UniProtKB/Swiss-Prot annotation:
<dbReference type="GO" id="GO:0004181">
    <property type="term" value="F:metallocarboxypeptidase activity"/>
</dbReference>
<feature type="glycosylation site" description="N-linked (GlcNAc...) asparagine">
    <location>
        <position position="393"/>
    </location>
</feature>
<feature type="region of interest" description="Disordered">
    <location>
        <begin position="53"/>
        <end position="76"/>
    </location>
</feature>
<keyword id="KW-0843">Virulence</keyword>
<feature type="binding site">
    <location>
        <position position="139"/>
    </location>
    <ligand>
        <name>Zn(2+)</name>
    </ligand>
</feature>
<dbReference type="GO" id="GO:0008270">
    <property type="term" value="F:zinc ion binding"/>
</dbReference>
<feature type="glycosylation site" description="N-linked (GlcNAc...) asparagine">
    <location>
        <position position="46"/>
    </location>
</feature>
<feature type="active site" description="Proton donor/acceptor">
    <location>
        <position position="322"/>
    </location>
</feature>
<comment type="function">
    <text>Extracellular metalloprotease that contributes to pathogenicity.</text>
</comment>
<comment type="similarity">
    <text>Belongs to the peptidase M14 family.</text>
</comment>
<protein>
    <recommendedName>
        <fullName>Carboxypeptidase 2</fullName>
        <ecNumber>3.4.17.-</ecNumber>
    </recommendedName>
</protein>
<feature type="binding site">
    <location>
        <position position="224"/>
    </location>
    <ligand>
        <name>Zn(2+)</name>
    </ligand>
</feature>
<keyword id="KW-0645">Protease</keyword>
<dbReference type="GO" id="GO:0005576">
    <property type="term" value="C:extracellular region"/>
</dbReference>
<keyword id="KW-0325">Glycoprotein</keyword>
<dbReference type="InterPro" id="IPR000834">
    <property type="entry name" value="Peptidase_M14"/>
</dbReference>
<dbReference type="Pfam" id="PF00246">
    <property type="entry name" value="Peptidase_M14"/>
</dbReference>
Length: 538
């Protein structure tokens, strides 16, 4: 098995508890529960009543949960809970996806609607909301918060009815059932499911993305957990104080109006709702490398291989919602799950309370993006600013604001841009590229005639290989020069028009300079001096 050291070293989710080499199954992290002094800073919240199997049926909790070798809720327990809710509530429909995990496990999901709509035939003038958890199998508060949300909706019929007046909701609690079974971050094949959204290496990724594209949501959330015990400072005696870290989608090819809606309405409301629940939050970050002695934290990035940005590039509002939980087994599980629940409910309530603004802004953003002739962004940078970040002293549990350098992506700054093509031309010898685009929800027309005429071509001027493996490949940084030429392509070539909602996913995949492009991952291999085999129409 490949040791994905580059991935594990930079990942906040794994942090200092990373697995340095992988085997088949049970790639579990060591458990380091909070000592008593730290645990005292994360007490149970008075009045909390969570309606999901881990809390209402404690006898169903797996024995390994207490020592960090399993999650709390088995597949069959989760499925039974969901089925019972669906039988008792006409507006809840239990479904099993028409595909299986890599080891043959099911994907149950709930479709919530006050009408007779479906994934294939959604309600008109309603928001479509996609909620998912369990992408990483060792982050149990992610899927549990989705189950608690379902339980809350069933117990609060008036609130559910108010939501469903304005939206249809699809809840996929467990994105990675094999990872949950092994209590590991990865898929069964040891690919990271949250790094496969562009290259689409695994069929499971493709299947779920096709369901997502079919539903075509206006709003989505992705529920995760982050490492609890990552220590900082000269004495390694302080840790993140937050219960919750969150981030909107940041890629600059998402319509600016949609990004502004995410930051100025949803993010502000989410922070207030977390505080109102007696919890603490900060923006989602990863640890950066700095030449100075000052701690550098990087705000959630713009890379499209991450689910948050990949979903956002379909022109929707997306939030990554992370709770403090990796590495501490069952400790503070009620508080962790509550943190996820508060964030998910905040997104739903904000959308309903501001329905006209939210619906109209997203729909206008989709139209504006679809008809835009503005340049597209291929690479960007994160300006460094000074700010503070909430920390907790592990010796006395005191809370304090620690000064840091902060690489911000709110917003990122464009570095390399290029004119937006009217369409891409793909030769018939690349049907696998077209299939990937179709998984994204991008439409491609197969031409019954030869194409003869002018195109924009990209001549490769530089290819630089990374120094390490990344999920089994050596990624590349590609530079090109745009030239004009005439070309003859045979019948069966593909025309991918860019006046479509999901075209931004084609931009990041097909423009070679993008960090997550098909060229970067070797799906379309290129070398210096080559002419890139995908062509642009002005």
């Amino acid at each position: 098995m490949v040791a994905y050291r580059f991935l594990t070293l930079i990942s906040l989710g794994l942090g200092s508890h990373c697995v340095s080499a992988l085997q088949y199954g049970y790639n579990q992290l060591s458990t380091h529960k909070d000592p008593a002094v730290v645990a005292g800073a994360f007490p149970a919240i008075n009045g909390t009543h969570l309606r999901s199997p881990a809390f209402t049926s404690p006898g169903t909790v797996s024995r390994g949960f207490s020592d960090g070798t399993s999650g709390p809720t088995r597949d069959e327990t989760m499925e039974g809970f969901m089925r019972r809710l669906a039988r008792s509530n006409s507006w809840m429909a239990y479904h099993e996806a028409g595909f299986k995990s890599e080891e043959g496990r099911k994907f149950p999901y709930m479709y919530l609607s006050a009408s007779s709509s479906s994934v294939e035939n959604p309600s008109s003038r309603k928001l479509r909301v996609w909620l998912q958890g369990g992408v990483h199998g060792n982050e149990p508060a992610g899927d549990q918060s989705m189950l608690v949300l379902l339980g809350d909706l069933a117990a609060n019929q008036k609130w559910a009815a108010k939501l469903l007046e304005k939206m249809d909701i699809l809840v996929l609690p467990r994105y990675n059932p094999d990872g949950v079974f092994y209590f590991q971050r990865y898929l069964a094949t040891n690919f990271d499911p949250n790094r496969d959204h562009l290259k689409l290496a695994r069929q499971q990724t493709r299947d779920i993305k096709e369901l997502f594209a079919k539903f075509s949501p206006h709003i989505a959330t992705d529920m995760h957990e982050f490492t609890a015990g990552r220590a900082f400072g000269p004495k390694k005696d302080f840790i993140y104080a937050a219960d919750a870290l969150f981030s909107a989608a940041k890629n600059l090819n998402i319509d600016e109006g949609i990004r502004q809606l995410s930051e100025k309405l949803f993010a502000k409301r989410m922070g207030k709702d977390i505080e109102a629940a007696g919890l603490r939050w900060d923006p989602y970050i990863t640890l950066g490398e700095s030449s100075s002695s000052k701690l550098l934290l990087r705000e959630a990035g713009t890379d499209a291989k991450i689910g948050r940005n990949a979903m956002g590039l379909s022109q929707c509002v997306v939030f990554l919602c992370e709770t403090r939980g990796i590495g501490i087994a069952d400790q503070h599980f009620e508080r962790r799950t509550l943190s996820g629940l508060v964030m998910a409910k905040s997104v739903l309530q904000t959308a309903v309370d501001n329905f006209d603004e939210v619906y109209n802004t997203i729909e206008r953003g989709i139209r504006r993006f679809t008809n835009s002739r503005n340049d597209i962004v291929l690479t960007d940078k994160s300006p460094i600013i000074e700010r503070t970040f909430g920390m907790l002293n592990t010796t006395d549990a005191s809370l304090f604001d620690y000064p840091i350098d902060f690489a911000t992506t709110t917003p990122a700054e464009p570095v390399l841009t290029r004119s937006r093509p009217r369409a891409y031309l793909i030769p018939p010898s690349w049907p696998d590229i077209v299939k990937r685009l179709e998984v994204f929800g991008v439409k491609a027309d197969k031409l019954p005639y030869s194409y003869v005429g002018p195109v924009e071509a990209l001549n490769v001027t530089s290819v630089t290989f990374d120094k390490e493996f990344y999920e089994g490949v050596v990624t590349t940084t590609v530079e090109t020069k745009l030239v004009e030429r005439s070309i003859r392509l045979p019948p069966g070539s593909y025309l991918v028009k860019t006046n479509q909602k999901n075209a931004a996913l084609a931009f990041v995949a097909l423009e070679p300079e993008n960090i997550d492009s098909f060229a970067s991952f070797g799906i379309i291999p290129v070398n210096t001096g080559d002419q890139y085999p995908i062509f642009r129409l002005k």
